[in-house]
Amino acid sequence: MAADKQNLQDAFLNHVRKAKVPVTIFLINGVKLQGVITWFDNFCVLLRRDGQSQLVYKHAISTIMPGQPINLYEGDD
């Protein structure tokens, strides 16, 4: 049963990617990046802004804040 559940990180990133929700990413060194997540994998996130893409390694990310409220799961879970 646990194998067919998606982890929270992937569910969050996939939701903001599909919905093209603008995000603010804070890195562990305090740098703030803003844009739309266009792709991600186990190690990095591709962030797009003003026609430019930035590859950001997940180990450098502290926080990802969506620019609008999101609802990942529906129901009583």
Swiss-Prot record:
Limits of the Sm domain: 10-70
Disulphides: none
Protein name: RNA-binding protein Hfq
Gene3D superfamilies given in the database record: 2.30.30.100
Known function: RNA chaperone that binds small regulatory RNA (sRNAs) and mRNAs to facilitate mRNA translational regulation in response to envelope stress, environmental stress and changes in metabolite concentrations. Also binds with high specificity to tRNAs.
A Gene Ontology molecular function term of the record: RNA binding
Subunit-level organization: Homohexamer.
NCBIfam families per UniProt: Hfq, PRK00395.1
GO cellular component, one term: cytosol
Biological processes, Gene Ontology terms: regulation of DNA-templated transcription; regulation of RNA stability; regulation of translation, ncRNA-mediated
Keywords: RNA-binding, Stress response
Record HAMAP family: Hfq
One Pfam family it belongs to: Hfq
Recorded coiled-coil stretches: none
CDD domains assigned to the protein according to its UniProt record, in alphabetical order: Hfq
InterPro entries, per the entry: Hfq (IPR005001), LSM_dom_sf (IPR010920), Sm (IPR047575)
Recorded superkingdom: Bacteria
Upper lineage: Bacteria, Pseudomonadati, Pseudomonadota, Alphaproteobacteria, Rhodobacterales
Family listed: Belongs to the Hfq family.
